[in-house]
Amino acid sequence: MGADGKLHDGPSSEWSRTLTLSADCGDGVSVHFNRGYVLSQFMARYMKRKGITLAELKETAVIVSQEVDREARAFLGGTLRETMLQMMAEVADDDGLELHAALYELSDEELVDGLVAIGERAHVVLANGSVEVEGEDENEEARTRLTDAGVVVHDRFLAPKALAHNKFVVLGRRTAGGFKPEKVWTGSTNWTPTGLCTQLNNGIMLIHEELAERFEAQFQLLAEAGDVVSDELLASNNRPKRGIPLGDATVDSWFTKLSGEIDIEELVDLVTNAKQGVLFVMFQPGNEPVRTLLRMQEEKDLYVRGVATQFTSTGAEEFKLLKQNAEDFFLDSAQATGVRKTVGEWAVEGTAAEFRANIGHAITHSKMIVIDPFGDDPIVVTGSHNFSKSASGKNDENFLVIRGHREIAMHYTINAMQTYSHYRWRAYLEEAAREHRDPFQFLSRNPNWQRRRKTGETKRMLSFWMPEG
């Protein structure tokens, strides 16, 4: 502001470098996420505009039908849905390609249509979901459609004793010498309307022959095992493959069920050796590695940010949702929730309880950990594994440990942080309402509020995100 009372150009910084928003991470890898933020302002205003309730959202914008709002469904599904449809379309359009998949749930009509279009060149190990009675089948309708279309279906009924919880796909070409794997797709996404659109999920596509061959070998073991964990399958699972080259990075590939919780030990070791910080998004994690992660946060002063749909461990009291100090309002970890009532111009989003009653039981369904993303050896853990004892010792699962790939780590870091930030605010509002506090009481016109940049949690946050600042 000049002496004349008008605005004038003053000192300014240089423009930041141009960035391109893309799923491509280089080295044949692309990372994909959906926009399943149902408890959000965007969806609250969408529902208000359409005159629908949270209970009606699933039928009108998620499940495929003649009346479904496909634009809303496409928005919620993001590049995750686009990529899953595209990989099936590529196989359907090329008679030389085949698709081999191991799936826990299959009920989304659009995805089932994609497999049906491939016909006999699609091979699927299909679980029976999470039934409570032996012999029941949550995927019965999809199984019938696939079989009628000539898809080669291998039944794998582990429930209710365990879950055949994989969601991986191997893409490859049929040659004179047999099936040649070329690509692998894995992640947290179940092939259901909620998996695509109303849960937060992720997927990773790797054009990588060695990894594709390893997942194909697992597919064959699962297909041959039927409804049990064969000795051959267990022996193979007990031999994780480490150090698979990926450009200048490496990948460790794990499958479960396995013996002795060696996968949990590996995850505990990873977070124990974190040097700067850890971000995570989880669905019903167990005690470990989360308990160790929280201990390391205190011992090493790590920057830790995370969201889980539900903390189920007996150590749940260790999860601090909100810090009491006004300057330390950041959550270390938060259970996903919505805005319970209108705050200013905010629209009512509904609550986590309403979500579970009308949409589904998973709000954040991703299973990912990012360790030291700005360090010399960033680590990403991603797959179907829920970081629990059941995932280790009972279920069919898979996960990758990607070491030293900065671009992949950045993709997962940004997604984890945006998820955390989204639910951090909602948890803060919920806490304020529960304690009858004004959520905006800490706002100040006094410039002294900036002093927090040099102390406490804000200082730790800035040093993590801007280590060169």
Residue ranges and their predicted role:
Residues 74, 237-239:
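Alpha-helical transmembrane segments and their helix-helix packing motifs
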Residues 203, 214, 218-220, 232:
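Extended catalytic-interface subdomain
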Residues 239-306, 313:
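Beta-propeller domains
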Residues 1-71, 81-85, 93-98, 112-198, ...:
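PLD/PLD-like phosphodiesterase catalytic module centered on the HKD motif
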Residues 228-229:
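Charged, low-complexity amphipathic helices and coil/IDR segments
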Residues 102-105, 128, 280-285, 310:
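Structural motif
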Residues 72-77, 100-104, 253-259, 356-358:
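Short, flexible loop segments at the rims of nucleotide/cofactor-binding pockets, characterized by
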